[in-house]
């Protein structure tokens, strides 16, 4: 506990300095628009690799376990995001309720996670889940989540990259709490394994504390967009229930370049086959 507090104190000292020093480098050439709640597999892979790079830069600075963003955790994160949308979960709504309860002197306050959505997916893999009591308060084991009141889901590639950058910056250096920073950096873990699997996804839900502003309809202020970063380490995987709906594929996700090369090779093979068949027919 003393070591944990020391780490939190150090993160606090660095927070204001590093937050100002870290800035996203805009790239106006990345102008293609995408719907973050309905991404193609290629774009999911693109953004996952960017998140993986940011995440591992943080881990490297702390000398902690490597993170692998792979297809299985992409599925996990996507399913959690769908759960948020299915439940109409408003993080700002939960925060408003927590403030109301705090004013009444309540100590055990709800937090923003849709723990039911997370537990429902974790259970399919036979992973441990939080108790019903903790679930009702938002308690869970696998998600770091960042929410913005800018409810736009149609963004340029540049804007999505910036949102992911801001997500990790917010996790690490928000200056208010360091539980997210500790989790992302794996700063207080005592486990002996050196791999964690992760995935990133997005969801859009109604903001129950706000309404659309007719003067700024493009901002979709009546909505909120969540960035979900889910992680499962090898220790958690080793403790799964024997009876489970899904297995967990630990295969690494290929790089975009490798995927493009594979697609090109397949296209060339198909073309060669078609050419050979055409020549045979002509003869």
Where are these regions (language model features)?
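Extracellularly exposed regions in secreted/surface proteins, prominently low-complexity, repeat-rich
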Residues: 205-256
């Amino acid at each position: 506990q003393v070591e944990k507090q020391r780490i939190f104190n150090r993160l606090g000292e660095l927070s204001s300095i590093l937050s100002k020093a870290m800035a996203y480098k805009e790239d106006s050439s990345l102008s293609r628009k995408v719907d973050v709640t309905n991404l193609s597999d290629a774009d999911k892979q693109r953004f996952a690799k960017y998140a993986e790079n940011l995440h591992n830069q943080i881990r490297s600075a702390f000398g902690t376990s490597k993170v692998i963003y792979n297809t299985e955790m992409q599925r996990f994160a996507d399913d959690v995001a769908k759960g948020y949308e299915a439940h109409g979960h408003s993080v700002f709504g939960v925060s408003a309720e927590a403030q109301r309860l705090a004013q009444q002197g309540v100590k055990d306050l709800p937090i923003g996670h849709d723990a039911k959505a997370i537990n429902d997916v974790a259970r399919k893999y036979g992973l441990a889940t939080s108790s019903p009591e903790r679930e009702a308060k938002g308690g869970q084991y696998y998600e770091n989540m960042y929410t913005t009141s800018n409810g736009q889901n149609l963004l340029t590639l540049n804007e999505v990259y910036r949102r992911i950058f801001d997500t990790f910056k917010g996790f690490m250096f928000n200056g208010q709490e360091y539980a997210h920073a500790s989790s992302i950096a794996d700063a207080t873990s005592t486990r002996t394994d050196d791999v964690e699997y992760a995935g990133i996804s997005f969801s859009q839900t109604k903001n129950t504390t706000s309404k659309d502003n007719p003067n700024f309809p493009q901002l979709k202020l009546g909505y909120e967009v969540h960035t979900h970063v889910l992680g499962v380490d090898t220790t958690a995987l080793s403790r799964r229930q024997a009876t489970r709906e899904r297995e967990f594929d630990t295969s690494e996700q290929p790089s975009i370049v490798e995927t493009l090369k594979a697609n090109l090779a397949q296209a060339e093979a198909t073309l060669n086959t078609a050419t050979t068949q055409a020549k045979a027919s002509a003869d």
